[in-house]
Amino acid sequence: MSSSVSSTSAPTKIVIPDLVSHCTIPVRCNRHWKQASVESKRWLFRGGNLSDRKRDAFHGLKAGYLTSMCYPLAGYPQLRVSCDFMNYLFHLDNISDEMNDRGTHGTAVSVLDALYQPHMHPTSRVGKMTKDYWVRLIQTASPGAQQRFIETFDMFFQAVTQQAMDRANGVIPDLESYIAIRRDTSGCKPCWALIEYANNLDLPWEIMDHPIIRGLGEAANDLVTWSNDIFSYNVEQSKGDTHNMIVVVQNQQGLDLQSAVNFVGDLCKQSIDRFHYLRENLPSWGPELDREVEIYVDGLADWITGSLKWSFESERYFGKAGLEVKKTRVVALLPRRA
């Protein structure tokens, strides 16, 4: 179902919800983060052929800092691969925003070919970068983690292609459809496979497919993704981008902007509460597997709290005003680009 957002008197600011206070999970950070961050950016700049302006943006992005809070116990080799993937994922997000569905599909083919056939020699830049981190990752990742990474990354590209088609056709999906596709466009699911890789876990499918484990991953994905929709709304609205839950809620429920922000904020808080509830109701698979499950679930929790902290310290959403926004929760809206 598609329609346009009803026009109202244009607001000049929004007040974002206080998600940081609602999240009581402690922040942890990997001790190797500075070295991994520097070397990973160097890897991206060399492989991605970025302009000076885009390089500056990646310095302000601080993807290595995010990665180090999300994988705090990883050894240096695993952290470095995870940093490379995170920088690369943001790079893919940036280039996919500039593409139509055909361009997105071409990128997907290059990436997935490199993952499914690592013995081949890719010719595109993105294919070469994919192969480079993938051959390092598969040295120690369990077969299950490798398969989950590839399958969920494939789902990511299917969803991003659908998003590009919706953007081209001016389609704003209903909330239920948006939630389903956003869980894949977020890129969180392959990052959950990296939790297994970064911590040298070998979890069987019957555990990873358990409703509570899947529910924990979904709750973490929802918090990371929906809070991101709040934090990125200002930049996105200035570009006319409608792939955002705030826009979807305004469109479907006829809410004004601040009410829509509050609505999404309440959903974010509910996702944190859902995560804690499921975590307290984990079944047991025996002492050895329970320890691996605990490490995996801790990794999901690290993503929740790490992403919230990073969002205000990165320059991606609030420029250099992130810490001020964190304190006041007031975001002055950017003018729409012509």
Swiss-Prot record:
Terpene cyclase that catalyzes the cyclization of farnesyl diphosphate (FPP) to various sesquiterpenes, including alpha-copaene, beta-copaene, beta-elemene, alpha-muurolene, gamma-muurolene and delta-cadinene. Keywords: Lyase, Magnesium, Metal-binding. It catalyses: (2E,6E)-farnesyl diphosphate = alpha-copaene + diphosphate; (2E,6E)-farnesyl diphosphate = beta-copaene + diphosphate; (2E,6E)-farnesyl diphosphate = alpha-muurolene + diphosphate; (2E,6E)-farnesyl diphosphate = gamma-muurolene + diphosphate. It is an enzyme of class 4 (lyase). Pfam families: Terpene_syn_C_2 (PF19086). Its EC number is 4.2.3.-, 4.2.3.125, 4.2.3.126, 4.2.3.127. Mg(2+) 1 binds at residue 93. InterPro entries: Isoprenoid_synthase_dom_sf (IPR008949), Terpene_cyclase-like_2 (IPR034686). The gene is STS-02. One of its GO terms (biological process) is isoprenoid biosynthetic process. A motif (NSE/DTE motif) lies at residues 228-236. A motif (DDXXD motif) lies at residues 93-97. Mg(2+) 2 binds at residue 93. It comes from the Eukaryota. The conserved DDXXD and NSE/DTE motifs are important for the catalytic activity, presumably through binding to Mg(2+). This is Sesquiterpene synthase 2. Belongs to the terpene synthase family. (2E,6E)-farnesyl diphosphate binds at residues 316-317. The lineage of its organism: Eukaryota, Fungi, Dikarya, Basidiomycota, Agaricomycotina. Mg(2+) 3 binds at residues 228, 232, 236.
